Amino acid sequence: MRTDLFDFHLPPENIALRPASPREAARMLVVQGDGVLRDRIVADLPDWLEPGDQLVVNDTKVIAAQLSGRRVSRETEAKIEATLIKRLDGSRWQALVRPAKKLAPGDTIRFGHEGKVCLLGHLDATVEAKGEEGEVTLSFVFHGPALDQAIADLGRPPLPPYIAGKRPADEQDAADYQTMFAAKEGAVAAPTAGLHFTPALEQRLRARGVGLQRVTLHVGAGTFLPVKVEDTEGHRMHAEWGSLSAETAAALNEARAKGGRIVAVGTTSMRLLESAALPDGTIAPFEAETSIFITPGYRFRAVDILMTNFHLPRSTLFMLVSAFAGLETMQAAYAHAIRSGYRFYSYGDACLLFRQPDERIVEP
């Protein structure tokens, strides 16, 4: 499918640089596929759900994956910025660095901003391998929990490029760029639909009879990568590690058998649920990497409703929502959102999408 079909123009003023306050005051565009677009706010979410429905949230926790350092292995030093994108083992990470041209295999980087050190001393890493587009393999001097603590001491929240390009990260982002469900460290980008939730909203959802289930998908930096090919068939999707427990699978299957709907909070929860779903729609336990790439024509097995933010043009995530609710429907919804001043991307507003009626699997 041609990728230019998923392109649109977004005025810069529609890009949110800070989240709404309180979080549930963010706007929410309800898209049911009946041709009517309804402007609401996130606090209204319980009104659109029924007793027995199950919300599925991602409990991944964003690590302080943005590191500043200096190349110290040559006569002249060079400033280096690194974003950790994937843990390889106890002491090695895959990272994106800039300027990549100043690094070669064997170089040593000493991390710490303006002379700052962690409790254990300097955090040094050796460039073990170098790939394309600034990608390197870093081997750190620390291992396991000691390395985790050093990264936490020295790192900063890895804000998306469309925010970081307009302002530096600050202490407020450490709280803002983390969901209330965050529990399991490993993400280098937030599952942003979850940012809209507050304890008060969760309480109202439970009072409505809506269940809440947790899954884990460690969001990688690949979520921000553009689709550079002209046809979706040529795009290679990034892999992310996810986990869905047997208990959660059983709860979701039981709820669906009783007529409840599965509501994915975010595209990360959606991708994990669809990865775990069997051909008949049964959700199975899952613990592995997934590189599922959802485009129009995909037959959804697990998810009935999707709550998500507004995504980048020509991105895999806009392709996903177009597959779920229909390309023409989403083109109209996004045009309405832009005209109406909705705020886009990670800190922006939400939309609540109902699956195209002919897409739900009828179980035997």
Swiss-Prot record:
It is an enzyme of class 2 (transferase). The keyword Ion transport does not apply. GO terms for cellular component: cytoplasm. Transmembrane segments: none annotated. Its main location: cytoplasm. InterPro entries: QueA (IPR003699), QueA_dom1 (IPR042118), QueA_dom2 (IPR042119), QueA_sf (IPR036100). Its EC number is 2.4.99.17. Pathway: tRNA modification; tRNA-queuosine biosynthesis. It comes from the Bacteria. Monomer. Belongs to the QueA family. PANTHER family: S-ADENOSYLMETHIONINE:TRNA RIBOSYLTRANSFERASE-ISOMERASE. Transfers and isomerizes the ribose moiety from AdoMet to the 7-aminomethyl group of 7-deazaguanine (preQ1-tRNA) to give epoxyqueuosine (oQ-tRNA). This is S-adenosylmethionine:tRNA ribosyltransferase-isomerase. It comes from Bradyrhizobium sp. (strain BTAi1 / ATCC BAA-1182). The lineage of its organism: Bacteria, Pseudomonadati, Pseudomonadota, Alphaproteobacteria, Hyphomicrobiales.
